[in-house]
Amino acid sequence: NGINPRSIRNVWGVIKAYETYVGKRGFQPSDPVFDQIQHAGSEFGATTGRVRQCNWISMRHIKQAIDMNGVNNLVVNKLDVLREVEAWKTTDNHFQDEVGFRAYLQNELGNSMGIQKIYFSDNPYNFDEENPLTAAA
């Protein structure tokens, strides 16, 4: 039973544009922008309601996950949160704007890691009138 690994052609990875963590271990130095990201992204644990700690994405961790799982297509979510707080960084780079951030991810992941396509999700509330979402969505 199961699926032959050779029959899987497209492996999709989905990441946030920033990292989050719920728990007791230390995660990052205190920075007001992380509180802004937490608030803008509604970063609370689904079961416990505990506040998620936020940090910049680590390209090392993303590359490791892509390599380990054979990802060849990637979706980057929560760009609207970084857009709201006007902060564009990774753990090792700072960008002037969203264009630079996207170009960096495309170069670092698309070109060097062999990712076929990288999709960047925009504001989830920006839908047309034929497909509205409720405020809770």
What are these regions (language model features)?
Residues 1-137:
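Non-transmembrane, aqueous-exposed alpha-helical and coiled segments at domain scale
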